Amino acid sequence: LLSYATAWQYFSAPRLADGTFATLMPYNVTWLPFTPTLSIDLGILLDPISVMMLIVISTVSLMVHVYSFGYMKGERGFQRYYAFLSLFTMSMLGLVVATNIFQMYLFWELVGVSSYLLIGFYYTKPSAVAASKKAFIVTRFADLGFLIGILVYGYYAGTYTFQPSEMALLKGGATMIPLALGLMFIGGAGKSAMFPLHIWLPDAMEGPTPVSALIHAATMVVAGVYLVARMFPLFIGYAPDVLHLVAYVGAFTAFYAASVACVQSDIKRVLAFSTISQIGFMMVALGVCTSADPHHGGLGYMAGMFHLFTHAMFKALLFLGAGSIIHAVHSNEMSAMGGLRKYMPVTHITFLIACLAIAGIPPFSGFFSKDEILTACFQFSPAMGWIMTAIAAMTAFYMFRLYYGIFWGGVAPRQESPSDESHTPHGNLAGVPHPHESPLAMTIPLMFLAVVTIVAGFIPFGKFISSNGTAYEIHLDWTVAGTSIAIAVISIAIATAMYARAKQPVANALARRFRGLWTAAYHRFYIDEAYQLSLIHISEPTR
């Protein structure tokens, strides 16, 4: 409620004379004074993107907290779970309202610790313990680059603050700013699971499913995007080449993750790679901005932030829907599902809404934000535009492959033992002959997020969030929009033809025909194995 009240008061306040919203610091104290002109403060910064993030984090976190009452009921460590969940939320809220980059780094590390605790919540499972360690180590490696970048930036810029006036007036050493920003992006790439630092995120599915919703929608993985957006004035002004590198890394990551998602059988891992791909879209949107744009790259920046907002809602809906399904069938594998629409109508409809949104079908929210990204990409270069359009088509395909595998086709044999994630007999295992709809504590958040997913696209987002602070009028490019809609519909039609029925001869024939490629994609193109071999080689003594 406090976040909503803050957002209401902030965005309803009169704009400044130059048409921008005021940047406010309602609280700020000096924490570590170094010199008369250089110190580290602790405080609260309110500007359009921090206030927008307050809404995103608070909304998704509230839904996850409510949902968890039903999902985690009867679990051992129930109180511990809520303590870790609240720490996670607090850490992300502290990160987005930080007044300076050192304060951001403090909460950045708290986000990492919180994710470690939640991913390893089932600490008696060796796979969960290994996944939590993997996430912690990979992101700590990336955070070393972030910390070095902060130190380089502070030394040469003479400031750590996020105040626009001070960021615009660097005291010297501007030639070192690209290096500092590049190092900071390494930290952002680790948190946001950009290739090749993405390897921790699929394994993070070992945590409880509501935790996955919070990590993927509103906390850890969007922290890297928020970092690039927060430092955007410096990227666009001093390091445009580094900003373009952000776009290229994001595009490759989006394609790689979409390719892997097309063949996964674990529903949470499909959604995990979907998240990696969609974060790639946000990075591309920020990266294709150029200083030559009269609005200082306004379209890409606005589109990236808009997609962060819409994605948070429909991705939380997808993960919570997946949790409802796992709660019913006690398995993450699509082979244990099929025909569930008959037994879980609320989960079915809400999950379908989220699939339509991420596929970019109007009037759902993902259509509006994704098409603004595609328009920005085409303005940057036709090649980038077509590449991202192709990845959007892959997104529609693998999401409806997932949808049909869960809710259509033949009714799969029901599991006789609970999945590793659950320790409490419920659903089938409690003597119910068929899967059943989840309790109200779980379905109410699904319905709420479904409504938000439908209406969020109609928010005049550019009126509130833009790169230079002034209102940005959104105009759909109907050539781009029409093309992307047509491609999305074709992709959905292909997925329907291949996966809607119980027997899938076309899908099976293609898997046999391209077995090598299918196997490589299923095993994530062996990136994890390559890391393991490299580390073993490095750790062995030279003979």
Annotate each language-model stretch with its function.
Residues 1-83, 155-174, 230-232, 241-244, ...:
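Transmembrane helix-loop-helix hairpins at membrane boundaries of multipass inner-membrane proteins
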Residues 109:
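Short phosphate-coordinating micro-motif centered on Lys-Gly-acidic
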Residues 1-12, 142-151, 354-358, 445-460, ...:
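Hydrophobic alpha-helical membrane-insertion segments
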Residues 63-104, 113-426, 432:
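Hydrophobic transmembrane alpha-helices and their helix-loop junctions in integral membrane proteins
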Residues 2-4, 60-61, 150-151, 183-186, ...:
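Hydrophobic core segments of alpha-helical transmembrane domains in multi-pass membrane transport
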Residues 534-542:
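Residue-level detector of conserved catalytic or cofactor/ligand-binding positions
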Residues 341-349, 402-491, 498, 502-533:
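Cytoplasmic/organellar membrane-interface segments at the starts of transmembrane helices
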Residues 36-57, 176-188, 388-391, 476-494:
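Hydrophobic alpha-helical transmembrane segments
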